From Swiss-Prot:
Membrane protein topology class: Single-pass type III membrane protein
GO BP annotation list: protein complex oligomerization; symbiont genome entry into host cell via pore formation in plasma membrane; symbiont-mediated suppression of host autophagy
Domain free text: Cytoplasmic tail plays an important role in virion assembly and morphogenesis.
Family, as annotated: Belongs to the influenza viruses matrix protein M2 family.
Known role: Forms a proton-selective ion channel that is necessary for the efficient release of the viral genome during virus entry. After attaching to the cell surface, the virion enters the cell by endocytosis. Acidification of the endosome triggers M2 ion channel activity.
Protein species of origin: Influenza A virus (strain A/Swine/May/1954 H1N1)
Ranges annotated as spanning the membrane: 23-43
Protein name per its UniProtKB record: Matrix protein 2
Main location class: virion
GO CC terms, sorted: host cell plasma membrane; membrane; virion membrane
Signal sequence interval, chain numbering: none
Intravirion-facing ranges: 44-97
Length: 97
């Protein structure tokens, strides 16, 4: 018996699938998981720069300023504002003379 006779057989001048297992819940679950996987893969490829940049740089918020005096908080804010975004999250401090 060949694979062709097990999967597809000619039915009244058309090709059809003679699968009785298509109502099996395992087959339905596998189909849903496969479709979800494909959708997530496509979204990942479309938005990978945005997603991974957000994960890599968005979670790094710097040290907490809780418990510090207001003067030290202001100094920290000024240092952060003096940093200039050069390329893809790489920072450089610019000092004016």
């Amino acid at each position: 018996m060949s694979l062709l006779t097990e999967v597809e057989t000619p039915i009244r001048s058309e090709w059809g699938c003679r699968c009785n297992d298509s109502s099996d819940p395992l087959v339905a679950a596998a189909s849903i998981i496969g479709i979800l996987h494909l959708i997530l893969w496509i979204l990942d490829r479309l938005f990978f720069k945005c997603i991974y940049r957000r994960l890599e740089y968005g979670l790094k918020r710097g040290p907490s300023t809780e418990g510090l005096p207001e003067s030290m908080r202001e100094e920290y804010r000024q240092k952060q504002q003096s940093a200039v975004d050069v390329d893809d999250g790489h920072f450089v401090n610019i000092e004016l003379e």
